[in-house]
């Protein structure tokens, strides 16, 4: 898409001749159950932010209902946009663009955000920026940490995704591994819900956070009490549906045995440890593969809702340190779905003059196709080796024990022939 010269020049002139001018972008996020709006500027300031989620209805319905989410977005977006503008002390004419999530996510939910963004951009004659939700998660670190430089590795873990990638630039990503089925957040959520009522202290708390709290109360070896086999998936890919299925089957067997009571904290600790070991084993393969090619970035950014889990983050950090990689976690407030990351990703695309932007209001279509699934970047899985030289001893990701590896070459050495005297 060609950038209209007059719009491009206006933005450049503002930044050159207005000493205190800072580009401002309104972001809209509706990929799932969070209705979110935010305004950020080029100085990396969050001028305003609003988020709304109907958790009570989700608890009543036992999870996320896409139609309910869409209705929530439609009813609340106008109010949240107006409040953001008021809180920021900004009028629409002071904005430089509108950014909106277009993929991936629940299509029916995405459409509501897209519709609101199109209407706002056309009404106020602003450029419209389509943003990739998962890229925004990775790029959100740039909003709060100026030490991060391209290229950096990005591990994104959420209720809908799990992927291992490298961010080479704002819109240039390489995908090295992803979940072939399920996600870590959904796995933990569904298994935990089958445990039943976790107690009144967890009312109003996301079930994933409840699992982490309960796991912290487990016995010393609680993380080993309910083990399952890790999924066998090629290269750096993952499978969380297999983990979910194994634990649901285990729960069913335990309940059929009337003599066995389930220790909830130990069960949560085992589930959490299994998810962490699976992620770590695949991240290790990624590290080994890129290290052999001498192109492993020295910074690793962890984002997405599951990154808020301190145990899983700790396991990844511990493994990364063993590979001489610095781990950086996105702020807790930016780990879950938010509009700040959408606005700032859009701002980066704007100042980099992205060809994906609809610069002229008259060129903005009446609708934009929403995609349920969309890879974060180009497929680079062919660069991942099938069998790394060293195998991670996954049990060592727990606690303070030093990370250990097994050199696979040792297993291939021929045994010395026995001698007889």
From Swiss-Prot:
Coiled coil: none annotated. It holds the Pfam family TsaD. Keywords: Acyltransferase, Metal-binding, Mitochondrion, Transferase, Transit peptide, tRNA processing. Homodimer. Required for the formation of a threonylcarbamoyl group on adenosine at position 37 (t(6)A37) in mitochondrial tRNAs that read codons beginning with adenine. Probably involved in the transfer of the threonylcarbamoyl moiety of threonylcarbamoyl-AMP (TC-AMP) to the N6 group of A37. Involved in mitochondrial genome maintenance. One of its GO terms (cellular component) is mitochondrion. Its EC number is 2.3.1.234. Binds 1 divalent metal cation per subunit. Disruption phenotype: Enhances longevity, resistance to oxidative stress, and perturbs mitochondrial reticulum morphology. Its cofactor is a divalent metal cation. Substrate binds at residues 156-160, 189, 208, 212, 308-309, 336. PANTHER family: TRNA N6-ADENOSINE THREONYLCARBAMOYLTRANSFERASE, TRNA N6-ADENOSINE THREONYLCARBAMOYLTRANSFERASE, MITOCHONDRIAL. Belongs to the KAE1 / TsaD family. GO terms for molecular function: metal ion binding; N(6)-L-threonylcarbamoyladenine synthase activity. It catalyses: L-threonylcarbamoyladenylate + adenosine(37) in tRNA = N(6)-L-threonylcarbamoyladenosine(37) in tRNA + AMP + H(+). The keyword Mitochondrion applies. It is found in: Mitochondrion. GO terms for biological process: tRNA threonylcarbamoyladenosine modification. This is Probable tRNA N6-adenosine threonylcarbamoyltransferase, mitochondrial. It comes from the Eukaryota.
